[in-house]
Every structure is written in structure tokens, then in C-alpha cells.
Amino acid sequence: MAITDTRPEVATEAEAPALTTSPNTVFGTGDHTTLGRMWIGAALLLGIAGWVLTALVGVHEIGDADVFTADAAFTMFTLGRVGLVLLVVVPLLLGIATLVVPLQVGANTVAFPRAAAMAFWTWLISAGVLVVANTIDGGFGGSRIEANDMMLASLLGLIFALLVATICLLTTAITLRTPGMSLDRVPATTWATLVGGSMWLLTLPVLAANVVLVYIDHRYGGPSEFGLADNQWAQVSWLVGQPQIYAFVIPVLGMLTDVFTTLGGVRQANRGFVLFGIGAFGVLSFGAYAQPFFYPEVADQALWAGMSLLIVLPVLLLVGAWAATLKGARPPAKAAVGAAGVAVLLLLLAVVAGALYVITPLELRQSGAFAAGQFALVVATGLAGGMAGLYYWSPKLRGRFANEGLAKLSVLAVLGGGTLAGLPLLVLGFANRFDGLADASDALNGIAVAGAALMALALLVTIGALLTASGDTPADDAWGTGQTLEWATASPPVPGNFGELAVVRSSEPLLDATETQEA
């Protein structure tokens, strides 16, 4: 077979299997549901470590504590930044998409399942090497040459793995759609995955090129200064700056749309505007060109400032479309809805902060604290949106609804953690203009540390909510208001996902079927 192991037309319905674990089902699997669970589990665990690391760096910044040496603090800072993106947010969203996208498009599995499995294990091994290399003074600017080379090589492994996983998902969405499902009819999460994955395919290879330049010059020497310790981080830091940082949360926009429409029990109003808004957000998040190391004047260019300002518009468009959809609807007070609402709030704060950052008279570009605060808000957006998706699709993920009490507790934790981790640092960023804020720096940093700790707690509680899921096995349409094809298969999905599917005639095929039966 060229793309899948089993053709959709020969897949048959079966009773949902029990979730069992064995070496074969873990290490040898190409099943997209199992791979999705592994991506999600690893990302949540690494997310806890990433936020703890962020909190420790914040403690170091308070007063004259000097808890760590300057080199150790810098290593922790850079590992925290790269880790929260490449080890947490992107893998978490990839995991959810690996589980959901094949179901949404009516495919029997993810495209290139063996490549998808290879991508996960390559990513996991590379993540382990990255962490080990940083702990033995091999981080950016580290003094141990061999360990530093190992860190750079592990970064290349991470990038390669994420690109392969992305290609598998994009191929699934483009080539394995069920009959009648044109691209303008794909569910919002699949559309956002297409947009986000396309941006990752355009930008992550640029990051890989940066790392290759650093690696070659550092290992073999040469006429350039790419490999010098002081220059390494500067060449890749664009990854966690704006507008590029927005690109890593694009799939969240689709997840929020699906949560609001399904749990609201209504069709998405102005669906075309939603698809356009997600696409526009993706285009405006392209940041591979904004590399101050090679182009110091980039912050003075109208293109960079304009993209940072304009990206607010598609976010407002999406918020307006979601509000119009929910007008008159009464979604249940479930954790999935709460997490989606928190993600919307954090996203609005992040893009407004990004717009303020580029306004020259405010003098925020010289503030590391302001940039750190915006970064925290964007990462928290990705995690809150991911939590909304996890709770929404928990019947497909675990075969049970998540523990609602713990899930709601995690929503409160991510709301408090995200705002506390980001807003105090944004306020501290104005210290260049208001001298009084400098005197409050210790207090503001302390609040940000508490926010980072709350984020770690939120992820821990999320794991608990998913693992303690209980109750009877939900119906195929677990919420009773499903609109898209993932709610037409068992919870959890059976091997092959589907039997014979009817031709899709709109973007909400299950809602069409329900309305036809009622008529």
C-alpha cells in the first residue's frame, strides 16, 4: 500500500476494543489513535518539566538571589524556551491532530503510518538527548564542545521528526478525505491543521538550516562566527519571538471552533469567515524572515511591525464569528467549554501585547521581560486550547469522558497560571518608561513564578483528569450533538475507524443526517 495499511472501503464496523497496553501495541504500532495518545502523554509530562524550569529561572531573577550561575541560568532559560515550543505545544497539538484528523476526514488511519510512528520515536529520543546535553553544559553557549554538538544534533532530530509527523497529517487531510468532502468542507480542526502544518513546513526547515550552520562552524571551525558560544542562541531565538511564535498555536483555532459549535449544538455561523480568519492568522504568523542576527534592522521594517499589528484582525474576526455562533445557544458548563474560553482570553491578551510591542514610542523592544510575558501568554494559549481539545475528544482518546471535577480544576489552574505567568512580565516591560515599576520588579517576577508553577499544576491535573476517566463507554456521538465524522465511529475508534460512509454533502454531515431524520 502506498499511503495506508487498510483501504477505507474494506474497513468494517466492530465492537470498540478495550484499551490494552503491551510492548507490541506501544513500540510497534502505526495506529493513529495509539500514536496520538503517546504524543499527548509525552508532551504533557514534558510540559510540567518545562514550566518548572521556567519558574526556577524566574526565581533566579528575583532580587540578588543568584540561585544559579549566569551560565546555568542561561542554559535553563534557552532550554525552557525551546522546550515549551518543540517539546510541549507542537507535540501536544500534533498528538491531538493525529488522533482526530483521520477521523474527521473519514480515513481509516493516518497517511504513512510507519513514518508517523518513526516520527514519534525520533522526537522522543531527540528530546531525551536534548535534555541530557543541556544538563551536562551542552546548551546554547555551553562550554563542553561535544555536549554542545550533541544538543545541536538533537535539535535537528526534533525538527526532522516534527516535519515528518506534519507531512503525514497534511497528506491524510489532502488525499484520504471521504467522497464528497472537498477542502472547503473539512472540519475546522482539520483546516487549522492544514494551515498550521503548512506554516511549520515553511519555517522549521529554516530553523534546521540555522542549526546546521551553527553545528558545522562549531564542530569544524571556519571563517564565520556562527558557531561561537555567544552567537548560537541569537541565530535561533526568532523561533520564540513574534510573529513566529503564533504559528505554533494555529491548530488551536480549529479546535475552539469545533468545541463551540458541537457543544453549542449549532452550525458555525459565517463558516467562510472562520476559514479565512484561520488562514489569515497563519499567513501573518510567518516569521522565518525575522532574524535579527542576520538582519538587525528587521524590527525597524514596516513588514514586521505591520504583521504584528494586523494579526489582531483575524483574531477579532474569529472571536466575532464564535460569538455569533453561540448567540442564543446554551453550551453545557463543561470543562471543554471553559478551557476553550480561557484559550480565547489568553490569545486576545497575547496578540494585543504583540501589537503594543512593535509601537516604537512605547520602547518595549528593549525589554526582555515584556517579550517573556508575551511568550508565556502564547504558550498558555496553546496549552489551554489543547486542554479544550483533550476534554472534548476524551471519548475518542480514552473511551470515557474525562473526570469532570479534575478537568474543571485544571481549567481554573490554566486561567490563573497563564495570566499570572504573562501579565506581570508585560507590566514590568514598561519599566523603561515608568521608573516606579523597576522598584516592583521582584514582586512582579515573584507573581510570574507563581503563574509558571500554576501552569505546571494545571498540566498535572489534566493528566489526572484523563487517567481517572470513568463511567460507561459513551455512544459513538458521545455529546449527542456531534456534527463531524469523528462522532460517527466508536468511542474509542475501532481498527479501521469506519465502515461504509455516505457521501458528504456539507461541512456538518452528522447534523445533516439528524435534520433529515427529523424531517
Question: What label would you give each PLM region?
Answer:
Residues 517-519:
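Short, charged juxtamembrane terminal tails flanking transmembrane helices
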Residues 1-10:
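N-terminal acidic, proline/glycine-rich, low-complexity intrinsically disordered segments
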Residues 364:
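Glycine-rich "HGGG/HGxG" loop immediately N-terminal to the catalytic nucleophile
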Residues 2, 36-141, 148-174, 188-264, ...:
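Hydrophobic cores of alpha-helical transmembrane segments in multi-pass integral membrane proteins
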Residues 9-25, 56:
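Short, contiguous pre-domain boundary segments
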Residues 183-186:
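Non-catalytic macromolecular-recognition regions in eukaryotic signaling proteins
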Residues 19-35, 178:
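Cytosolic juxtamembrane amphipathic/interface segments immediately preceding
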